[in-house]
Amino acid sequence: MIFQYARYICTLLIFCCSSIVFSQDSFIRGKLLDVQTGEPIVFATIRVKDRAKGVISNQDGSFRIPTRFKELGDMLVISSMGYQKKEIPITGLSPEYINIIRLAPGILDLSEAVVTAQKKRKLSARRIVRKAIANIKRNYPLNTFSTIGYYRDYQLKQGNYVNLNEAVLEVFDQGFSRIDSATTKVRIYDYKRNTDFEQDTLADDPYDYKRLLKIVDNAYLDSYGGNEFSILRVHDAVRNYKVGSYSFVDQLDTDLLKNHSFSRDNDTYLNGEALYTIKFRKRHPHYSAFGILYISYGDFAVHKMEYTLYDDRKRLPDRKLNKHQGRGQLIFEITTEYQRHDYGKMFLNYISFENSFILWEPPKFKVENSTIGLMKSPSGGIGGFRLELTFNRHPNTDEARDVGNYLVRYKGKRLKIKTAGLVKNEKKVFLLPDMTQKERKEILEGIFEAMKKKINLNNLFSIEIEPIFDLEGKNRLHEWKKRDYDQFREYFVQQVKPSTKLPNDGKFMDKNKPIFEGQAMVRPEDFEEYWMNTPLK
């Protein structure tokens, strides 16, 4: 006879060697640091010279290159916004240690562009952005091309990588004149769940707004069936400039200028090309949004776009400030960088999408079932009853025996409890009601009648339990625990094929299904030319 209880309470380069040694020598590992500050250089491009292949540095500035390029005597070309471009012989890098490479911030040399700069100095920030939007069709490919790159998604929990999933993908894009989500195809070369890092099955589930178990607070993020790469693609506002992308950029060609205020900042350069730096922001009663655009002096091509949105209704703890000197908590941050190809067109170099999310962890301590135990009288008949609660863990002894922690009702009327005790060697508590003989008889008759008519005993009894702890004192009864995570999805291009054809066979990724669950995988003959830039553990 089981009934449920009814309550939830709820460039200068310097090579140094670190002390870390790796036994695996299939990759040369490096880390990029700012020579002045010692801070990691994030999302720098590391290319193998004349091979059009490379990687992008990780959040900690780390990267890895297959040792075969060292055997071939190749050079690495390192470039990053605002730093001097540098070439490094791979033969000078250690295969055993993390190679620390320090880069010096670049100095913008306007000697060759001074005339152009003087002519364009009077351009307002808003006018520069307007020209950049108008020139998208001219600056980006309109015909089919593909990129091959390293994709990963993961979460950060207290600064540590969790649920790291990695893949090598080829993305067949039919050009900026076509709708990306409807026409782009993706072929998976390889994918894996990296079990060298912590796995958290709850955090790895798709977003769940129906049960509110995993959500972006005060925002909505379509789960796309759990396909994180599909989520990433739709958040490239430049590629999707004619459709909605994310608040408050929305549809870039019609809404970016309308929704934001703009200002010019100090110009910079990348690979010798002078770039305007345009800052913009959105003011809203509940949100703050900040963005930066890096736009070419010459053809107004967008080289890079950064966008960060904060929820000003949720404050950072301990009076901390976010990187824009506000107190709002991060909702999402997106960074997209395009690079100019030899043909003059701009192709994706990388895209990174970070969002915070809330995960509600189910209670670890709960009541599994409630039963009624019939008690014999000295004469052998039924002389009484007791209520029995079975827990999934041993409850705290003192709290379990405190009758004040239980509120029992029979047919809506409170039933006083005389004694609460523990059943020996079981995770069970019994409750003895304090009743008159008349009340006992009436309730027993009600129980027998319900059994006879197969009536659910929930219609007779309800039990509310205060949030007692388990025996270890770590888990409160039926308490859902809120956990805050940062989710990342990132795609780093290793090779661009500026002119290609869509393969005839249909072995493409299902965009509405998780990448890492039974997707078709195709490995080309040159598969070994590509690799996963796994973060340092």
Where are these regions (language model features)?
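Extended beta-strand-rich segments in extracellular/periplasmic secretory proteins, especially
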Residues: 135, 239-296, 301-308
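Short, acidic Ser/Thr/Gly-rich low-complexity loop/linker segments typical of extracellular
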Residues: 52-62
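Beta-strand-rich domain onsets/edges
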Residues: 19-27, 104
